A protein has these predicted regions:
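Conserved beta-strand -> loop -> alpha-helix junction used to position metal-binding or nucleic-acid-contacting
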Residues: 170, 232-239, 244-281
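DNA-recognition alpha helix
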Residues: 122-133
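Short, amphipathic alpha-helical "recognition" segments used to contact nucleic acids or chromatin
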Residues: 106-118
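Acidic/histidine-rich catalytic cores and adjacent linkers
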Residues: 1-6, 39-42, 47, 284-393
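Mobile genetic element proteins and their domesticated derivatives, centered on retroelements
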Residues: 37, 72, 84, 111, ...
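Active-site phosphate-binding and catalytic loops of NTP-dependent enzymes
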Residues: 43-58, 150-161, 173-178, 380-383
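Short, conserved DNA-binding cores of transcription-related domains
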Residues: 2-90, 94-98, 174
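RNase H-like nuclease fold core
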Residues: 63, 78-85, 92-101, 131-234, ...
């Protein structure tokens, strides 16, 4: 019994590379992956197509098309299907595909947990079938979760190098806890390396604990893994974050996100007709060439609205200075570190995945999925270019 690689697949890859060069890499890789999955199915079944043998477990049942996004482009995959497996035999899904798509594996486990625990809906069932291509059992879910968790925990506990700048953010997801559905905080930290200016995802944490305790423990875990050399921390004014920074990173300057300050200011504008002028006034503050000019513009802003919008003037005088810390950095560095907008794409990718699951069965399931997503994003960042030129002034 032999299950060798089809020579036609190799010839196809060669032809694609000859005709298209590097631009054909995604097609060439898809051909190889499809061949690997076909070969894996034959080994799983114990027989190749049309092969008669007593060792055969079941039969091939065609292929299911799937488009997979990767760092080299979209891959048109053909996922092998099986049928007529003996009772008690686990279903087939190519390991070669799963190993390359951590976030998809995590999402399948999250949805499968809901299905197994009896909290699924008709919609979740359909998603499970669509993503997994087979029914799931509790043993399959446990095995998949254990393998994935070991890999993700290793990533979360890896050593951290010196980071010049750190950005912190928080988001909330729905999790089942104690018979009810509650908001669970997801804390994220990214950094800019002091040596090469590249961005990296430092860590992620999921917890139902009180905000200040969660932030303090999260920051402590980053320091334990080697975080040092931080010149500036940028974040929004999240509950408990400032207290956590004071406890764990005293003396490190804090920059409050200018974008969120702009948005928060609108809550204190008494008339719709004033909103555009208020926004422009704050832009004049934030876009000043140096700190002294920013403070002068802030003084003019407060004076301008002291009578016609006193609540806005008082709020601005107390809060806007927290968004001016970034003026201690070189001009080019300021544009990157004055807001948390650099985390926007990361949060979008997380949201795109978590909204499919809707409500997570537990904290571990949420942590698994979020970690898997940020690991993939981090790999893309590491393979990409410089985020901040540390030699620029």
């Amino acid at each position: 019994m032999t299950h060798g690689v089809d020579s036609n697949a190799i010839e196809q890859v060669v032809e694609v590379l000859i005709d298209e060069g590097l631009e054909g890499m995604s097609r060439a890789f898809a051909i190889l992956m499809n061949e690997a999955m076909r070969l894996e199915r034959s080994r799983f079944l114990g027989a190749g197509p049309y092969e008669r043998t007593e060792e055969r477990l079941g039969y091939g049942n065609g292929y299911k098309p799937k488009t997979v996004k990767s760092r080299i482009g979209e891959l048109q995959m053909a996922i092998p299907q099986v049928r007529d497996l003996p009772p008690g035999c686990e279903g087939f899904y190519p390991r070669s595909l799963e190993r390359g798509l951590r976030s998809e594996r995590a999402l399948k486990v999250a949805i499968a947990e809901m299905y197994v625990q009896g909290v699924s809906t008709r919609r979740v069932q359909k998603i499970t079938e669509k993503l997994c291509g087979l029914e799931v059992s509790s043993s399959e879910v446990s095995r998949a979760a254990a393998l994935l968790d070991d890999e993700l925990e290793s990533w979360r506990s890896r050593q951290i190098d010196e980071m010049a700048y750190v950005t912190l953010d928080a988001r909330y997801e729905k999790v089942r806890h104690g018979g009810s559905v509650v908001d669970c905080a997801v804390l994220l930290a990214t950094g800019v390396r002091g040596d090469n200016g590249k961005r990296t995802v430092l860590g992620v944490s999921v917890s139902l604990s009180e905000a200040e305790v969660h932030w303090r423990e999260f920051l402590a875990s980053l320091q334990k893994r080697g975080l040092h050399g931080v010149k500036l921390v940028t974040s929004d004014d999240h509950k408990g974050l400032k207290a956590g920074l004071t406890a764990r990173m005293p003396g490190v300057p804090w920059q409050r996100c200018q974008f969120h300050l702009q948005r928060n200011a609108q809550a204190y504008v008494p008339k719709m007709s004033m909103r555009r002028a208020v926004a422009q006034g704050l832009r004049d503050v934030f876009n000043a060439p140096e700190r002294a000019e920013a403070e002068r513009q802030l003084g003019l802003f407060v004076e301008r609205y002291d009578e016609k919008a006193p609540r806005l003037a008082t709020w601005a005088e107390e809060n806007i200075p927290q968004g001016l810390t970034v003026f201690t950095l070189p001009p080019y560095h300021r544009t990157r570190m004055r807001t948390t907008n650099g985390l926007e794409n990361l949060n979008k990718q997380i949201k795109r995945r978590t909204r499919v699951a809707t409500i997570f069965p537990n904290e571990a399931s949420l942590l698994r999925l979020v970690t898997a997503v940020v690991v993939e994003i981090n790999e893309a960042w590491e393979a990409g270019g410089v985020y901040i030129n540390m030699k620029s002034a």
